[in-house]
């Protein structure tokens, strides 16, 4: 089973690692066979599984249910679970809700925010809960951002994001996840923290790992598709098409053919 120590080793060795969202045991098993390194039980299940307009209605109970299902189906990947909207507003909430999803099978929890999360990160880490902090475009704050848009478009905004990353890493964050930021910034942050694995989604191909929502990479997105998405399913055929799509994603992340230039945001900072 892959651990946080393995992710740190991968970064030190320059080996890129793969991450996909997953919500059920059957997909989890296919990801195990494809040797996907990391699985995120994301609150994206609100949209991808529950058919909602955002992640905001998702509950801790939802996250624990799907975490347990994924863990039963996959004994290979590191399992990371989102704490959903407003479930870590207080330190006590963060501890109790982290306990719930960790007992369901998570090895790490993910929370969204910046420097203001430092105390939460510190308390969780001291209590044995590895924390991934999600920065950049954070879907739980979609109404604050006014929609799903590229973040850190200016040098000033990029420096603020770097300051947020620094604060949470110093507080003990084990992993960073950057969403929807310029490729140059993704590279800067990955290089700035040599002992902290950085996962990207729409953050260029210089981050240490890459994550996609599984429905997106299988072509099950109806309507507008984000720039950073590649449909790996359309390249496959036959009864093993889904498994082959997972294998193709894993290989493309490792050889850095994904994300390609067309999947990234090129902004001069």
UniProtKB/Swiss-Prot annotation:
Keywords: Cytoplasm, Magnesium, Metal-binding, Pantothenate biosynthesis, Transferase. It is found in: Cytoplasm. Pathway: Cofactor biosynthesis; (R)-pantothenate biosynthesis; (R)-pantoate from 3-methyl-2-oxobutanoate: step 1/2. InterPro entries: Pantoate_hydroxy_MeTrfase, Pyrv/PenolPyrv_kinase-like_dom, Pyrv_kinase-like_dom_sf. One of its GO terms (biological process) is pantothenate biosynthetic process. Gene3D superfamilies: Phosphoenolpyruvate-binding domains. 3-methyl-2-oxobutanoate binds at residues 43-44, 82, 110. One of its GO terms (molecular function) is magnesium ion binding. Belongs to the PanB family. HAMAP family: PanB. This is 3-methyl-2-oxobutanoate hydroxymethyltransferase. The gene is panB.
């Amino acid at each position: 089973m892959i651990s946080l120590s393995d992710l740190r080793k991968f970064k030190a060795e320059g080996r890129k690692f793969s991450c996909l969202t997953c919500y059920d045991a059957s997909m989890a098993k296919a990801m195990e066979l494809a040797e996907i390194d990391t699985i995120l039980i994301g609150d994206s299940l609100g949209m991808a599984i529950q058919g909602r307009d955002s992640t905001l209605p998702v509950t801790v109970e939802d996250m624990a249910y799907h975490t347990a299902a994924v863990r039963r189906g996959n004994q290979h990947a590191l399992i990371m679970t989102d704490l959903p909207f407003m479930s870590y507003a207080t330190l006590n909430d963060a501890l109790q809700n982290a306990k719930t999803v960790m007992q369901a099978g998570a090895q790490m929890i993910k929370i969204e925010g910046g420097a203001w999360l430092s105390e939460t990160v510190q308390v969780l880490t001291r209590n044995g809960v590895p924390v991934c902090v999600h920065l950049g475009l954070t879907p739980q704050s979609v109404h604050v951002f006014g929609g799903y848009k590229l973040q850190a478009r200016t040098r000033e905004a990029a420096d603020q994001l770097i300051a947020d990353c620094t604060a949470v890493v110093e507080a003990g964050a084990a992993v960073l996840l950057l969403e929807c930021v310029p490729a140059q910034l993704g590279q800067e942050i990955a290089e700035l923290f040599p002992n902290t694995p950085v996962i990207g989604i729409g953050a260029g191909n210089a981050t240490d790992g890459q994550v996609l929502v599984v429905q997106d990479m299988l072509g099950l997105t109806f309507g507008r598709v984000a720039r950073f998405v590649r449909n790996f399913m359309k390249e496959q055929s036959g009864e093993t098409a889904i498994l082959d799509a997972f294998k193709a994603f894993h290989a493309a992340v490792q050889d850095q053919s994904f994300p390609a230039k067309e999947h990234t945001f090129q902004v001069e900072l």
